[in-house]
Amino acid sequence: MSARLLFVSKGEASSSTRYRALQFFPLWRQAGFEPAHLTVSGGAGATLAMLREARRADVVIVLRKTFPAALLWLLRRCARRLVFDFDDAIFCNSDGTPSRTRMARFVAMARASDRILAGNAFLARRAAAFNPAVTLVPTCLDSGRYRVDAGKPADSFDLAWIGSHSTRKYLAEAMPWLAAAAAKVPGLRLKIIADFDLPGCGVATLPVAWHADSEARELAAAHIGIAPMRDNDWSRGKCALKVLQCMAAGLPVVSSRAGANAEVIREGETGFLASSPAEWAARIALLAQDAGLRQRMGEAGRRLVEADYSILPVFDRLRSVIDGLA
């Protein structure tokens, strides 16, 4: 009889749901499991459905959600095995400041779980303080979706940034070094793959609406990927997905020296880490002047993703955890 896996999240549009659950469903089925997803975003109906389906499942995997104490108690009673999967610093506020409420719910969720799946080493350490049953399962992607042979514009030199309005602040804070880089690189253009534009940022922009079926192609059509971010608990909880996407598309990456980005990027091999406007501008100028370096770094990044952050090797790690519970 196939083991039933119930994945609970705030919705299919969430990147956590897509990258840490839904993309694995074909592999789960091939392995003889029965995966199902349920959206729980408030309301008594969704809550009752979760509890009902939890009773029918062999393993319940909660993605990036915590619950009020009473609901968590009910879920724990209904679930034979409970797994908590998270890839963000959901125990603090989005500006990195502490939150007693978020931390209390995070601690309760961690302690109630049979196993915790953490998206990076920082998150794993935080969870292990409350439950030693932690496995690091990095956020990964299907590298086969990303082509590295897309044509690139000849009349501009494009920096690709991919994100959403919620992460717009990181790009806005990059305006000083974007202007400095534009002074060094003729034709520099910022390609924003998101749901907004950033006029007046000190460099020409090309806004491109984000779509799941076109993001890989749009990335590959740029010259460099960039990943500016702050260095606080919230950003340390990020799992370098944007960096991995750029690498999968064959782009060298320049990133802030912070969080999982600094762990994934191999300095001078797959990209560069920068800490100041001058350093950002210098790294971008160096890559703009050396097509061979861009190609070597892009190829090295692609190999790294295929070896360590692609869907098959990560699924093997994930399955070993679930096999031990189901």
PLM features: residue spans?
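Conserved catalytic-core segment of nucleotide-activated headgroup transferases in glycan assembly
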Residues: E12-L27, A31, A36, D142-Y146, ...
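Membrane-proximal helix-turn-helix segments that form the acceptor-binding/catalytic region
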Residues: L48-R56, A70-C78, P98-I116
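Conserved acidic donor-binding segment of nucleotide-sugar-dependent glycosyltransferases
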Residues: R266-A278, L286-G292
